[in-house]
């Protein structure tokens, strides 16, 4: 099994962390990318997933309300569903949970829907 390098993780932190109009807790960003690197464990699949997250964040920032409203303990948050790689008939395996503050998009977390465990249960604790 390939391991994602620290340099690649740092680059991913930089790319996602500097997305204009997006704010996210740094510790949560690092945690989410570390988990992502264990799921998409080859350089190619990791880069594809990070690029899709970055693209989706820009789309969310531009459009604001393009996704599902959450309920219960995550009410006032939204969930955006998308593919880790753009392939016909691939299910939307990635999620971004965010809130529009009016001034910026506050990201609570991102990751694979099911791996390594339920995404929503993981970010609920934040």
What are these regions (language model features)?
Residues 55-63, 71, 78:
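Short, contiguous, well-structured surface segments enriched in hydrophobic/aromatic residues
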Residues 1-17, 21, 74-126:
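Enriched for short, Lys/Arg-rich terminal
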Residues 67:
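Phosphate-/polyanion-interacting regions in eukaryotic proteins
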Residues 1-58:
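Arg/Lys-rich, positively charged N-terminal/basic patches that mediate binding to nucleic acids
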């Amino acid at each position: 099994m390939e391991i994602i390098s620290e340099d690649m993780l740092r680059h991913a932190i930089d790319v996602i962390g500097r997305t204009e109009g997006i704010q996210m807790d740094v510790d949560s960003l690092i945690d989410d990318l570390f988990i992502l690197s264990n799921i998409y464990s080859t350089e190619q699949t990791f880069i594809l997933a990070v690029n899709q997250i970055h693209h989706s964040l820009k789309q969310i920032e531009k459009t604001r309300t393009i996704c599902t409203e959450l309920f219960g303990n995550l009410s006032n948050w939204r969930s955006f569903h998308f593919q880790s790689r753009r392939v016909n008939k691939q299910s939307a395996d990635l999620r971004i949970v965010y809130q529009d503050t009016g001034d910026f998009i506050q990201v609570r977390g991102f990751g694979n829907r099911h791996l390594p465990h339920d995404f929503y249960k993981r970010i609920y604790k934040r």
